[in-house]
From Swiss-Prot:
Function: Component of neuronal acetylcholine receptors (nAChRs) that function as pentameric, ligand-gated cation channels with high calcium permeability among other activities. nAChRs are excitatory neurotrasnmitter receptors formed by a collection of nAChR subunits known to mediate synaptic transmission in the nervous system and the neuromuscular junction. Each nAchR subunit confers differential attributes to channel properties, including activation, deactivation and desensitization kinetics, pH sensitivity, cation permeability, and binding to allosteric modulators.
Signal peptide: 1-22
Tissues where this protein is expressed: Expressed in cochlea, keratinocytes, pituitary gland, B-cells and T-cells.
Gene: CHRNA9
Chemical reaction(s) catalysed: Ca(2+)(in) = Ca(2+)(out); K(+)(in) = K(+)(out); Na(+)(in) = Na(+)(out); Mg(2+)(in) = Mg(2+)(out)
Binding-site positions, Na(+): 191, 193
Further comment: The heterooligomeric receptor composed of CHRNA9 and CHRNA10 has an atypical pharmacological profile, binding several non-nicotinic ligands including strychnine (a glycine receptor antagonist) and atropine (a muscarinic acetylcholine receptor antagonist).
GO cellular component: acetylcholine-gated channel complex; cholinergic synapse; neuron projection; plasma membrane; postsynaptic specialization membrane; synapse; transmembrane transporter complex
Keywords, ordered alphabetically: Calcium, Calcium channel, Calcium transport, Cell membrane, Disulfide bond, Glycoprotein, Ion channel, Ion transport, Ligand-gated ion channel, Membrane, Receptor, Signal, Synapse, Transmembrane, Transmembrane helix, Transport
Name of the protein: Neuronal acetylcholine receptor subunit alpha-9
Consequence of substituting residue 172 to K: Decreases response to acetylcholine
Family matches, as InterPro entries: Neur_chan_lig-bd, Neur_chan_lig-bd_sf, Neur_channel, Neuro-gated_channel_TM_sf, Neuro_actylchol_rec, Neurotrans-gated_channel_TM, Neurotransmitter_ion_chnl_CS, Nicotinic_acetylcholine_rcpt
Membrane topology of the entry: Multi-pass membrane protein
Length: 479
């Protein structure tokens, strides 16, 4: 029983395969006959219309498969496209009943007439025409030609907002030799097909609208139609933010810190020059990938502004260092500088001398209080205090002479002791004078150093605010 079922199944399979081979043989036979009949007297050199005054319509459809490269410096877009062209050939029609119902065949595209549709704004020396793939020929003469092509087109790149820029690249297709009265071109859809697009790592595609244009050129009076596909691109800016923008922001915030370095360290100017060199390197990196146009990119403007701030900070640092190292030969601090810088600005910026309390300058307040009290005393009381102090000094001088034996001794001993007293007095006066001069010199230098320190702190905060505001403005401009 099982053996009989197996024989029946084998017979059915053999019969079906035989019928399939017979059908394929019949199709191949009729296709060959159709091919011979169609191309017996056919010429692909002439426009396939029965009436030469009739316009041949060509429908164009573009499918964007991949963006291979966007060369901003040379302003060239390299794209991988699938190009579909559909037109009607009046000489390639047949009756399906005469060829066993055969309604379409596939033949090499170079055997039939093809519209000379080219990319008007191509930017390479090599041919960017579609590949010679087969065409699908239908019984009513409708020809469909699908072919891939790698195109290089010129694209005007606007780098004003780089790396947050949007670009619009046009792909303009049209007939090179036929005017609009001979071959008219239409777009199959309102936009290019993006269903098979492979996502690009650098660019986002936001659309590809298509528009038909009819243009009359100066060379010819006839109209020339074309179809322009506008590729809307938005740059993925993460790479440039991480590698170009964030390092620049961090480096720019280092520039104000040069004012915080002690002047005696000798590294203030070196830090500014080092930061300036780093910014120059980043500026050169941006210049290498940008086209040589008059539009300065947004990040380039940020670099230039930052470099200007760093240059200004370095120049001001040199000025402050000159103030810091004012020595004994320098003039005293002017009165206005004492009031504005040492009295008010130092308190606002929390700049104090070494050993002086930053929170509660107690001794300074006591000294100011005593000065105010003495200034309020009457003139008579001040005169009495001075006379009392003078009499006290004379009394102490008399006691010192008695202790040294200048009085109450014989004349020879008194003269000897008085000479020693005079020498001792002169030495003490000399030492006191030296100490006073040294203190005055140190006080003058300390005042200039404090002036320099206050100016340093003032410029540090000013430059911090400027860098912060500039960064916010750049980000807001990008948005």
């Amino acid at each position: 029983m099982n053996w009989s079922h197996s024989c029946i199944s084998f017979c059915w399979i053999y019969f079906a395969a035989s019928r399939l081979r017979a059908a394929e043989t019949a199709d191949g036979k009729y296709a060959q006959k159709l091919f011979n009949d169609l191309f017996e007297d056919y010429s692909n050199a002439l426009r396939p219309v029965e009436d030469t005054d009739k316009v041949l319509n060509v429908t164009l459809q573009i499918t964007l498969s991949q963006i291979k490269d966007m060369d901003e410096r040379n302003q060239i877009l390299t794209a991988y496209l699938w190009i579909r062209q559909i037109w009607h050939d009046a000489y390639l029609t047949w009756d399906r009943d005469q060829y066993d119902g055969l309604d379409s065949i596939r033949i090499p595209s170079d055997l039939v007439w093809r519209p000379d549709i080219v990319l008007y704004n191509k930017a390479d020396d090599e041919s960017s025409e579609p590949v010679n793939t087969n065409v699908v020929l239908r019984y009513d003469g409708l020809i469909t030609w699908d072919a891939p092509a790698i195109t290089k087109s010129s694209c005007v790149v606007d780098v004003t907002y780089f790396p947050f820029d949007n670009q619009q690249c046009n792909l303009t297709f049209g007939s090179w030799t036929y005017n609009g009265n001979q071959v008219d071109i239409f777009n199959a859809l309102d936009s290019g097909d993006l269903s098979d697009f492979i996502e690009d790592v650098e660019w986002e595609v936001h659309g590809m609208p298509a528009v038909k244009n009819v243009i009359s050129y100066g060379c010819c009076s006839e109209p020339y139609p074309d179809v322009t596909f506008t590729l809307l691109l938005k740059r993925r800016s993460s790479f440039y933010i991480v590698n170009l923008l964030i390092p620049c922001v961090l480096i720019s915030f280092l520039a104000p810190l040069s004012f915080y370095l002690p002047a005696a360290s000798g590294e203030k100017v070196s830090l500014g020059v080092t930061i300036l060199l780093a910014m120059t390197v980043f500026q050169l990196m941006v210049a290498e990938i940008m086209p040589a146009s008059e539009n300065v990119p947004l990040i380039g403007k940020y670099y230039i502004a930052t470099m200007a701030l760093i240059t200004a900070s370095t120049a001001l640092t040199i000025m402050v260092m000159n103030i810091h190292f004012c020595g004994a030969e320098a003039r005293p601090v002017p009165h206005w500088a004492r009031v504005v810088i040492l009295k008010y600005m130092s308190r606002v910026l929390f700049v104090y001398d070494v050993g002086e309390s930053c929170l509660s300058p107690h001794h300074s307040r006591e000294r100011d209080h005593l000065t105010k009290v003495y200034s309020k005393l009457p003139e008579s009381n001040l005169k009495a205090a001075r006379n009392k102090d003078l009499s006290r000094k004379k009394d102490m001088n008399k006691r010192l002479k008695n202790d040294l034996g200048c009085q109450g001794k014989n004349p020879q001993e008194a003269e000897s002791y008085c000479a020693q007293y005079k020498v001792l007095t002169r030495n003490i006066e000399y030492i006191a004078k030296c100490l006073k001069d040294h203190k005055a010199t140190n006080s003058k230098g300390s005042e200039w150093k404090k002036v320099a320190k206050v100016i340093d702190r003032f410029f540090m905060w000013i430059f911090f605010i400027m860098v912060f505001v500039m960064t916010i403005l750049i980000i807001a401009r990008a948005d």
